[in-house]
């Protein structure tokens, strides 16, 4: 078996395609009208056809039990870009206890999107502050071998 992507139901396909392109830079790789695949194997499905596929008229949006997760190597540039996108935030940008910066916001149908700083960039950011691999591993609560691997990438 092979995992091939995540499908989310959307109420307005054109609005969603525009959002995912303009905010996250995702391009359409396949467009079948009611079903659209974007870069990264994110699949958009119209709400009407999703109801048919799952044989239910009860669809719950505004659910905070899952998210689409992306990583960004230039977090400062992305956060600057995001300020001009008019998104509704789950929370403002923050730094997790392990040092990774992240932001969560909603798509047009209130699906949660997280954009986190690429973990290799977190390691390199700490290294730029003259932290040793041992110090970085302790700060991030990760194995020292992981830190050393990140530093060579």
Place the predicted regions along the sequence by residue:
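Conserved short beta-strand elements that form part of the metal-binding/catalytic scaffold
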Residues: 27-62, 112-117
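Compact recognition or signaling/catalytic modules
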Residues: 2-10, 37, 42-47, 81-82
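N-terminal beta-strand motif that seeds the catalytic metal site of vicinal oxygen chelate
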Residues: 1-14, 66-68, 118-153
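Short secondary-structure junctions
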Residues: 25-30, 89-92
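Amphipathic alpha-helical segments
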Residues: 12-27
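Vicinal oxygen chelate
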Residues: 13, 65-112, 129, 140-145, ...
């Amino acid at each position: 078996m092979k995992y091939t992507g995540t499908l989310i139901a959307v109420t307005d396909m054109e609005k969603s395609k525009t959002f995912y392109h303009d905010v996250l830079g995702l391009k359409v790789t396949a467009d079948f009208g009611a079903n659209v695949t974007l870069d990264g194997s994110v699949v958009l499905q119209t709400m009407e056809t999703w109801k048919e596929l799952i044989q239910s008229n009860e669809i719950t949006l505004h659910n905070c039990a899952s998210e689409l997760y992306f990583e960004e190597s230039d977090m400062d540039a992305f956060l600057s870009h995001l300020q001009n996108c008019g998104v509704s935030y789950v929370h403002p940008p923050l730094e997790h206890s392990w040092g990774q910066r992240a932001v969560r916001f909603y798509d047009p149908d209130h699906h949660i999107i997280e954009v986190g700083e690429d973990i290799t960039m977190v390691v390199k950011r700490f290294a730029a502050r003259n932290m040793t691999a041992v110090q970085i591993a302790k700060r991030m609560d990760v194995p020292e071998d992981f830190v050393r691997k990140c530093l060579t990438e």
